[in-house]
Regions:
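Internal, well-ordered alpha/beta segment that forms a basic, Gly-enriched binding/recognition surface
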Residues: 1
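Compositionally biased Ser/Thr/Gly- and acidic/asparagine-rich
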Residues: 4-269
Length: 269
């Protein structure tokens, strides 16, 4: 199925409360487009063969802010998902997050959704440093802290969410363009399968990583000490907390809302 920011379909037309559907099922006759946001689910393991042309150049992707109003909704749910756009990495290599060019009206943060269960991958053991989170949760990766949070990568075929800044999340505003770079280390080539991201050469960032780990969920919080940032939302340095399906979360509360990645001039106190 394919994601549409500009839709809020009614799931059951006979019930006014079943809205917010933003995914459309696709059939065998539908054509997939590079870098669009798709979701594939199967009850059992299955192989998919996707023929097409490889992309070897920069790619501009368009963000819309046209989610229609929902009858009987209130508050932020009136235009549910407004300005939140889902894409997929159609390169055969990982995208370097710090090479992405964001316009000023878009948050310089990549949000990656985790569909897998971390404990299934680690056997229940605690693993630090890789920024893993529980299934059903988004991981916020700000552009300027990406090397420390998630190895600075959007893996090939990985879905990711981009959104307008809070001030620019206005209905029916102009589209915005984000540029995904291919040349000059815009993507990270993989010569062989990797079990973990390779080392990234970058200036050291002063940070504190806090892990919440239990039998039912796992979550992460990153605090960065960076001169010139504040206790409010600093675009490119802070990542908002998206609350998913797990029952326990960890985040820092700021004047601009909860953050999963928070940068300030000091993290003392």
């Amino acid at each position: 199925r394919q994601y549409y920011e500009n839709q809020n379909w009614t799931v059951d037309p006979s019930k006014s409360s079943t809205f917010y559907a933003k995914w459309k099922d696709l059939g065998n006759s539908d054509v997939l487009a590079a870098f669009k946001g798709y979701e594939i689910t199967q009850e059992t393991a299955k192989k998919y063969y996707i023929p097409g042309k490889l992309v070897y150049c920069d790619k501009d992707i368009k963000l819309t802010r046209k989610a229609p109003a929902v009858t009987n909704a209130s508050g932020a749910n009136v235009n549910y998902g407004l300005g939140q756009n889902i894409f997929g990495n159609s390169f055969t290599s990982a995208i370097s997050i710090d090479k992405i060019v964001f316009p000023t009206n878009v948050e310089s943060t990549v949000y990656i959704y985790n569909t897998g269960r971390f404990h299934d991958w680690t056997g229940g053991s605690t693993v630090t440093g890789e920024g893993q989170i529980a299934a059903g949760n988004y991981l916020s990766i700000p552009k300027n802290t990406a090397p420390a949070v998630w190895g600075n990568q959007i893996p090939s075929m990985q879905g990711f969410l981009l959104k307008f800044t809070a001030a620019e999340t206005t209905f029916n505003g102009a589209d915005a363009t984000v540029s995904l770079k291919y040349a000059n280390n815009g993507v990270t080539p993989n010569s062989k399968p990797q079990l973990a991201p390779g080392a990234v050469k970058t200036n050291a960032l002063s940070s504190l990583q806090i892990t919440l780990d239990s039998k039912t969920t796992r979550d992460e919080l990153w605090l960065f000490s960076q001169e010139g940032t504040s206790n409010k939302f600093d675009n490119g340095w802070d990542g908002r907390k998206f609350f998913g399906t797990p029952t326990a979360f960890i985040y820092t509360d700021t004047p601009d809302g909860p953050m999963q990645v928070s940068s300030n001039s000091t993290i003392d106190g």
